[in-house]
């Protein structure tokens, strides 16, 4: 639903410019996204507990900036992280959700913290979801099967009655492995 690249890469480009970095924003973005997954998987596999989505995004950004030898200050990173509060939905996502709302329950199942998800739903997506489920109640990140089992129990549905629709293949793989139907968009 949310356009992370479209929302964050302009701000990331500004950060790189402010730091005098010569790195291409697309290169840094791709590496940062890969590092985010590694950080989430480490939390899951090493049973480190749920660090929290925004904490993982920050930790992976710091790792990426250091890897690319970008000279930055903590205040610059703090300023950049505020962009996560201003994520924009894809142009067609809201219209699609509005069309679906009349015929099925809309449930947000996300790696983000619950309060953060409520903020995004109310202020950025501006759609009323029937349920907002955060992985923080499970203590694992998607695609851990426990996340999908928890959501099915909370919704009082069998996994086969649910469909995960996502723009990330790992969401679909985890959902399907847990008995959900999945659709990659």
Residue ranges and their predicted role:
Residues 1-91:
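N-terminal helical cap/lid subdomain that shapes the substrate entry/recognition surface
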Residues 29, 33, 128-139:
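A short, structured active-site edge motif that brings together acidic residues
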Residues 73, 127-131, 159-162:
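Short acidic capping loops at alpha-helix termini that bridge into adjacent secondary structure
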Residues 75-123, 132-135:
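Substrate-recognition element of Asp-dependent hydrolases with the DxDx(T/V) motif
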Residues 105-107, 130, 161, 181:
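Structural signature of beta-strand start/N-cap positions in the alpha/beta core
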Residues 109, 140, 164-165:
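Conserved SAM-binding loop
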Residues 142-156, 173:
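Short loop-to-alpha-helix "cap/lid" segments that border enzyme active sites
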Residues 160-185:
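Acidic, Mg2+-coordinating phosphoryl-transfer loop and its flanking beta/alpha structural elements
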């Amino acid at each position: 639903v949310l356009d992370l690249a479209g929302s964050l890469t302009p701000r990331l480009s500004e950060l790189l410019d402010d730091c005098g970095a010569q790195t291409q924003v697309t290169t840094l973005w791709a590496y940062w996204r890969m590092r985010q997954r590694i950080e989430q998987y480490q939390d899951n596999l090493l049973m480190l507990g749920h660090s929290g989505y925004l904490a993982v995004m920050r930790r992976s950004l710091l790792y990426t900036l250091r890897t690319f030898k970008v000279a930055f200050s903590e205040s610059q990173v703090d300023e950049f992280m505020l962009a996560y509060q201003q994520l924009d939905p894809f142009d067609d996502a809201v219209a699609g959700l509005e069309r679906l709302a009349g015929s099925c329950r809309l449930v947000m199942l996300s790696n983000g913290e619950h309060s953060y998800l409520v903020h995004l739903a109310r202020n950025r997506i501006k759609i009323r979801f029937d349920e907002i489920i955060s992985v923080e109640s499970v203590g694992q990140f998607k695609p851990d099967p426990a996340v999908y089992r928890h959501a099915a129990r909370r919704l009082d549905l069998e996994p086969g009655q649910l469909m995960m629709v996502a723009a990330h293949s790992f969401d679909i793989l985890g959902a399907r492995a847990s008995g959900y139907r999945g659709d990659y968009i």
